[in-house]
Amino acid sequence: MDIVIVVISILLALIVGIVVGYLVRRSIAEAKISSAERLAKQIVEEAHRNADAAKKEALLEAKDETHKFRQQAEDEIRERRMEAQKQENRLMQKEENLDRKSETLDKRESSLESKEQSLTEQQQQIEEMKSKVEAMKDEQQAELERISGYTSEQAKQIILERIEKEVQHESAVLIKESETRAKEEADKKAKNILSLALQRCAADHVAETTVSVVNLPNDEMKGRIIGREGRNIRTLETLTGIDLIIDDTPEAVILSGFDPIRREIARMALEKLVQDGRIHPARIEEMVEKSRREVDEYIREVGEETTFEVGVHGLHPDLVKILGRLKYRTSYGQNGLKHSAEVAYLSGLLAAELGEDVTLARRAGLLHDIGKAIDHEVEGSHVEIGKELAMKYKEHEVVINSIASHHGDEEATSIIAVLVAAADALSAARPGARSETLENYIKRLEKLEEISESFDGVEKSFAIQAGREIRIMVRPDEIDDIESISIARDIRKRIEGELDYPGHIKVTVIRETRAVEYAK
């Protein structure tokens, strides 16, 4: 029972608690709802107030924007009106200009109509005058035919023939003048090219002689060179082919010989013997053979050096060795190898001025006198020998022709061949390049004057410019101007046929006439 009561009490207490809790929560909820409603009402009221303010602000902004837009619209309308006014003014000006142009065109049209009418009248007058002129021309032509006895065709033919002759004469004169001008310009250009080439060419060699001198330490060495009964000197002369001249010249022996290579071998051998001190036939033979080998090697080296200096490459080794032998070959005292190198250099310069192959020109110039290296060993002129060597070693056909034509033996078939001949003449005629002995020089000058004075009408002659020019004075009462030209040509032919000389000789004939009167 007690437990039931307790349980019922607990249940009642629990129900009362629940009811009380519900009521309390309900009162709290109602209080919150009331508070929320008040807050909501405040928010609504605040929102209404804010909305009214925003509405007023928006209205103000809208009014402001409307005012600005209206102002811009008015400004734009005003600008458009002004632009329309300007366009209207321009159109009015154009209209006025068109009106003025229209008036001008009307005036021109009326003027042209009047001019056209005037031209029509003038044309009619011209036609009438043409008819009259034709009639007068026919009458005059008939009258001329009657008077001259020629028809118009015959007269026309005569006039044409006369005009043709005049034109032919004038053409011949013009052609001659053109040829003269062309020759003068060609000569001037050639002189300029030659002068440029000579200015750019600096030669460093001088004339050489046909003797060599070997210095001795003392005069006792002369006896040792001669040897017992002259056996040493005979052995040396026999092995080298060179004459040894032992005279009163102190401490010197002179070697004389035409072949420069043999002379050089003899000089080197003799210097070695003098330096060694042992001089007897066996030693002489040994030194001569050693010197010969050294000279051969030197010839090869100097040939290679020359080709390198000139800029010519690809020569056959045998041809290089033959070229080196020109080192010991002279012409009128001018060293053959130096002359060939100078001709090669000049040929290259001339070819460069004319736009030709410089390398080929130098090659042809270097080999132009190659035949002189062995012309004393092989039959024929140095030109023929050089041509055969070039063909043997398969040189370029331009090189072969340059060798064959540089002395006029064959016709030059290329510009380079002509340039090589010109360079050869320049090198030979250069002052100091070639020389003669004093005796031959004097004899040549005397022979020059003798040849010149052997002609009739020659009063006297003078060899000047070291024998490079001969001036002949003729008697004016016996020789006229035309005969002066003939005498100059005849003297030139005599000189070419009877004299040997380096370079060229200028022949000048002078004819002077003087008229003298005395006033009293």
UniProtKB/Swiss-Prot annotation:
Q: Where in the cell is it found?
A: Cell membrane
The record's keywords, sorted A to Z, are: Cell membrane, Endonuclease, Hydrolase, Membrane, Nuclease, RNA-binding, Transmembrane, Transmembrane helix
Keyword Cell membrane part of the UniProt annotation: yes
According to its record, how does it sit in the membrane? Single-pass membrane protein
Q: Which Pfam families match?
A: HD, KH_1, RNase_Y_N
GO annotation terms (biological process): mRNA catabolic process
Residue ranges occupied by any KH domain in the UniProt entry: 210-273
- What family classification does the UniProt entry report for this protein? Belongs to the RNase Y family.
Q: Which PANTHER family match?
A: RIBONUCLEASE Y (PTHR12826:SF15)
The protein here is known as Ribonuclease Y
Provide the species name: Oceanobacillus iheyensis (strain DSM 14371 / CIP 107618 / JCM 11309 / KCTC 3954 / HTE831)
